[in-house]
Amino acid sequence: MGVFAGDSKTAKVGLLCAASVGAVAAVATGALAASRIKTLCSLKKLSSFAGAYNLYESAVAYRYDLDAIIESGVEDDQAYIDAVCKQVFPGIPVKVEAPKFACSAFCAEAPSSVLMGRNYDFKDDTSALLVRTHPKDGYASISFSALNNLGANMPEESLKSKVAAMLGPFASLDGINEKGVSIAVLTLDSLPTRQNSGKPKINTSLAIRLVLDRAASTQEAVDLLGSYDMVAMAGRDYHFFINDASGDSRVVEYDPQNPARPMVVTHAREITNYYACYANEVLPNQKNGALGHGKERALAIAEVLDGVQLQTKEVAWKALRCSSQEPNPEDITSNTQWSIVYDNINCTADFVLRRNWSEVFSFVV
């Protein structure tokens, strides 16, 4: 197991940054342009795996307004993407496909740390982007986005891809903030949630950004999500696994057996692609209709965690390895793209890309 600081590919990034200045200056001036240019130039490549899929890092220097995005209306994916593009890079068109999410997640407690393990599983291969954000009126965080969802698996290769990668904060799939709150999204088999109770609407990606920026505990995250109507993205349904520094781990989901799709919160140590609120009705190694699948992976995680007295990082990695998945083109939730152990007390993340278990990248919020 190795820990790497990464190689920024300085020469190539420098050339792209120079080219980017003209593009930004065409639509912005002053502080607006400077913050976009700084963000563009922060992109660096951290890994050097063979092939098209690697780990990148970007630090967000521009300001964004989540409330303005929400107020613009996120009734569908395109409306959300348009609102985000106006915030991130006004005046430059960026075509982005809505993301999809799979996975496994669990909480483990050790004497000096509270850990959240996370496998991001999806059939389409992807590079990963570590996104650093520190909004003016919010909490600093690190999160991970799938660059394939942004059409930018090799962002250093073109200005178009580099610009698309700037949307990373609004396509994050998991992350942790400076208060020790971590969150991961997992896909489900039910029809997409579309709540319509009269509250302001958010979607799947906005939920993650809101929690990372504004929640100091799991309870605050639950209260925050409960103040909005949920609109699921990309034609699929999802739930959220949330943990904090106290070890308060819960699954937030939207009841598929109630037409109004009310938010339901369930305490759980581990979860995959089935409803925690209907866990007793879900069988392993099979599809369970709208209630989901993948319980065998949760049981494998539980077996590892229950088999030890101290749930260390080594134990967390063992649980992630035993629940990781090889590629299967017929299964959207196969093919583990990355695995992470978040430490909610020390606010760190240890990251492995595409089951390369011997190469671990470590980050601090």
Language-model features: where?
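General structural feature for long, well-ordered alpha-helical segments within catalytic domains
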Residues: 217-220, 224, 297, 316
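Short, well-ordered alpha-helical packing segments
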Residues: 209, 222-226, 302
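Extended amphipathic alpha-helical segments with heptad-repeat/coiled-coil character used for oligomerization
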Residues: 235-285
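Secretory/export targeting leaders with adjacent low-complexity proregions
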Residues: 220-236, 240
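Long, charge-rich alpha-helical interaction segments
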Residues: 287-314
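N-terminal mature-domain region immediately after signal-peptide cleavage
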Residues: 3-4, 13-16, 20-216, 230, ...
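Intrinsically disordered, low-complexity coil/linker segments enriched for acidic/polar
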Residues: 7-8
